[in-house]
Amino acid sequence: EFRRVLFRSFGSASYKEVCADISAYGKYGSMELTDTAKEIILEKAAEKIGINRYTIEQTSRDNVETMQLSQNGENGSVLCRFITIHQENVEYEQYLYIGVTLKNTVDASFTYEKLIRQIMEEMQIDTEVNVNLKGQIHGALTDTQKEQFAQDMLDMMNAKLSVGRHMEDVYTVYAYNKGIKNYIMIGKDKVNVNICIGYDEEKNETTVYLATPMNMQDY
């Protein structure tokens, strides 16, 4: 299965630290909901994810109302947001965001990816679920080493390189694997694998990001 290959390719290096972020964001429905309904939706999402020690808070700023459910722990965190945007003379918009962060492991990433996908599908929200794996390596890599590192990962995944680009200290790769059902288009190319390799001079650390279909984090 491709997920196992993805983990194996990511885990082929000796990382100091690893973490994973799994998230999805999409437009919700055509009927404006009450605060009670929003809270029920967030609580049902939390129940499906498997958390019960969460807190819920509501904020309002300018034309944006946000109801947020969150739970933090030593091994990770969960953040669910129901966002309502009101603009004068414009129809309101509602969005649902669900994010799970795992610390010190990436093993359960695709379990949560499946859960979040199910939640979004049940709510008839058309969106992509992003899985971002992140690891730190001590020291710097040359541009050639970054290219080889990324190519080795692609080879293990049987993914075809679409674009590879150096920008300052970051090497970014966009690729496609036909074993992954979902993809996005960059120009005329299908893309569903994204690798970013960057360097932090102060920490003397190289950070590797492996995402499907696209890295949504700062690097």
Where are these regions (language model features)?
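Intrinsically disordered, low-complexity segments enriched in Gly and acidic/Ser/Thr residues
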Residues: 137-189
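Extracytoplasmic beta-rich ectodomain segments of secreted or membrane-anchored proteins
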Residues: 47, 55-142
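Short, hydrophobic/proline-enriched secondary-structure or compact coil segments at domain edges
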Residues: 20-29, 92-101, 207-213
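Ser/Thr-rich, low-complexity intrinsically disordered terminal regions
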Residues: 54-76, 162-183
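Short, small-residue-biased leader/transition segments that mark boundaries at the very start
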Residues: 1-6
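Soluble, non-membrane globular domain cores that form compact, hydrophobic packing
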Residues: 9, 87-92, 110, 117-128, ...
